[in-house]
Amino acid sequence: MENLYALILGIIEGLTEFLPISSTGHMILGTTILGIDIDEFWKSFLIIIQLGSILAVIFVFWRKLFQGLDIWLKLAVGFFPTGVIGLFVAKYLNALFNGWVVVGMLIFGGVVFILIELAHKNKQYRINSLEEISFKQAFCIGIFQSLAMIPGTSRSGASIIGGLLLEFNRKVAAEFSFLLAIPTMIIATAYSIYKEPELLGNANSLIPLGIGFITAFIVAVLVIKFFLKFISKFDFIPFGIYRIILGFVFFYLYYSGILNAGSEFKL
């Protein structure tokens, strides 16, 4: 069963990491439905499969990444506020590890996506390529991304919203969000290992780890390509509606006692 669970969680990770719908929320549902007790091995597993998602971004965007130094400088500037804010608020984040926070942020984020799209209907966007993004705008996106430290927000959702507010077109907002995930997720993963080095020692079951990693990579590649095609034709309103529905699903699960708003959240 361990290998099957690894496959399912790898699919969930690949499907949700880069869509603006909260990968954390879906991982809570997945582990709860499967009845997985998040022990040290599964903590290690969840870290490893994120690396598969990071590799997917590099695989899809490798040409853009090696076009020159400019994009790397913008990513560094974009990561800077997230890193600094993270260092200062990390010790206070435990207070937010609550299912009701997830509910609120899922619904709030969904409403924001819908309102932004309605406000920008038929509007011409000013930023239509990665090259047009200024360092100031990259820094602002990093500030928005830092909001993803609040559970249920969605890292990609927060940074995409930032891009839309700065008048990036949808594709550019999504692409910069995906690329900004590379330094953000790598450093976040390294920090998790630094805090709990014993997690690497628990990653001793190579088959499920390999299954989860490869599955997350393949699914994330497909999702990124699909998502970019989707938003070239449609807006983000469907994702906003989905977030709201998911938020109310969690509300019911927590209110009815099916899920514990405190304990089940702490992955």
UniProtKB/Swiss-Prot annotation:
InterPro entries recorded: UppP (IPR003824)
Localization: Cell inner membrane
One of the GO biological process terms: response to antibiotic
Membrane topology reported for the UniProt record: Multi-pass membrane protein
Record NCBIfam families: PRK00281.1-4, undec_PP_bacA
Protein function: Catalyzes the dephosphorylation of undecaprenyl diphosphate (UPP). Confers resistance to bacitracin.
PANTHER family: UNDECAPRENYL-DIPHOSPHATASE
Protein name: Undecaprenyl-diphosphatase
Lineage summary: Bacteria, Pseudomonadati, Campylobacterota, Epsilonproteobacteria, Campylobacterales
